[in-house]
């Protein structure tokens, strides 16, 4: 909808005060990676980018710049039909950055990248944001978003479920717990009224609803030995799963 490829049921989307199609040279305003494989298979990476630069009035020097930025200089003259998924993804990112836009929209940018490539895109996204650009990323990899994103928008079945920071979503998810290891697990469970205790092993409890100091004081007051008392922070993935539990379109049967 931001790029005008689909119409909202109500409202409108603008970039710098105009719809995407209303800009004379859209690539210089917003760069987007949606489907990296939507390329002419007979063109080289270099000529693909040159064609985009020509149609949008972008200086040809930007082509060499983004090829170097994405690590594609050595394959710039090869036809894209021979590119791997990861190479195609890098070319899509190069095209998104070709116009040096202030806004970047990337859909699943790490798709097909090897671990080195994932680290590269993570660093790239942060550097783009540090330059003052707006970077919008759509991803299902919550572990990666936890390392990259500053702000999250979560949508489920067309409804806005969250519009908050990563830290705030995790903090309010209610998933934080405390791992307790004690030979008196059954006795401690009885004493921790108001908390949810899940037995992970005969001597191990995962306690939700109480902080570690309070659990420690309760155990000390009743002479219960503790071998471990470790706060377990909720993960972004768990917070996301809890938030979207009722908004999943397709649910498989338990294995």
Task: State the predicted function of each range.
Residues 121-210:
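ABC transporter nucleotide-binding domain
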Residues 211-255:
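C-terminal coupling/interaction segments
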Residues 54-57, 171-174, 193, 220, ...:
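A generic structural signal for secondary-structure junctions
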Residues 1-137, 142-150, 154-156:
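ABC transporter nucleotide-binding domains
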Residues 60, 77, 88, 163, ...:
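Structural motif corresponding to alpha-helix initiation and N-cap regions
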Residues 71, 195-198, 225-230:
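A short linear hydrophobic-aromatic micro-motif
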């Amino acid at each position: 909808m931001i790029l005008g490829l689909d119409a909202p049921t109500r409202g409108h989307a603008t970039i710098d005060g105009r719809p995407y199609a209303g800009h004379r040279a859209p690539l210089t305003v917003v760069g987007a990676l949606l489907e990296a494989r939507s390329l002419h298979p007979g063109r080289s990476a270099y000529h693909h980018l040159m064609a985009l630069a020509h149609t949008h009035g972008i200086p040809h020097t930007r082509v060499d710049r983004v090829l170097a930025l994405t690590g594609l200089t050595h394959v710039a003259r090869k036809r894209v039909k021979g590119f791997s998924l990861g190479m195609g993804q890098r070319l899509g990112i190069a095209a998104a950055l070709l116009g040096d836009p202030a806004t970047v929209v990337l859909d699943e940018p790490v798709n097909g990248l090897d671990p080195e490539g994932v680290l590269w895109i993570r660093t790239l996204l942060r550097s783009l944001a540090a330059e003052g650009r707006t970077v919008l990323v759509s991803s299902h990899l919550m572990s990666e978003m936890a390392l990259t994103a500053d702000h999250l928008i979560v949508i489920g079945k067309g409804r806005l479920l969250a519009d908050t920071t990563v830290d705030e979503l995790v903090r309010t998810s209610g998933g934080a717990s405390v791992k307790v290891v004690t030979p008196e697990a059954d006795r401690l469970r009885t004493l921790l009224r108001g908390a949810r205790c899940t037995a992970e092993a005969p001597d191990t409890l995962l306690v939700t609803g109480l902080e570690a100091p309070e659990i420690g004081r309760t155990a000390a007051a009743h002479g219960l030995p503790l071998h471990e008392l470790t706060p377990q922070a909720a993960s972004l993935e768990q917070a996301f799963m809890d938030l979207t539990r009722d908004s999943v379109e397709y649910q498989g049967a338990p294995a």
